[in-house]
């Protein structure tokens, strides 16, 4: 009689436990959906793309029917960008991916000859958007000029600091990574005092193969150089595609436009990557066309990211 009287209660308890586990499992599945193309998948798509560039062959690139391609700001067919057909070697390579957004970004150098005496060298940047393992967007920028007399051939080995995974204690959220990049752009735009940006004491910045801070030609630090009021561009169309929490990497493409008071400041569209460690800007690397020939980007602004619950 005692066992018989407790049996319904036991079954009820078991049902409640199982229902609770199922609810938590369903909630976890909703909170962290698996991306349809993870880091490995995105990197493989980029590898196919860069090999296609060097082979001048687009046949293995899985392009969506809605694919849009731009080269230096102009719409072009796939495989018809400035360096396609000329690029034979890609000595400098730096890849970045974000499975959350399906973004792939790359900064490198290409040359048209298999030796160091190539007739032409380019700084080369590309952004891909991947949806359902197909490429839906390609944004290429290439530049065969020099900044302060430094050729793209000067770049040989990418800085692996961007690949280093940070200890959890030194990581910040996606939202903070994005906010930190925007603070930097606000400083450049002159809307935020540079003292208010989170600088790391080791901060350095590389632009088109040139260290532009802490050097004889540009003695200012990442922060202190903004004491010079001429260092100003209005940064528009800030498209932050990558926010890698584990590595502390955030990357964007933006329009740097000349301010009215300094109309001779070179306007361009820049690929720019930041290493954020302990919430501080430790390293910055940018590539862009260093002359006035770059067209203003016609890629649309990105909507703000909606942070996941608990972020």
Spans of features found by a protein language model:
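C-terminal and inter-domain tail/linker signature
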Residues: 27-311
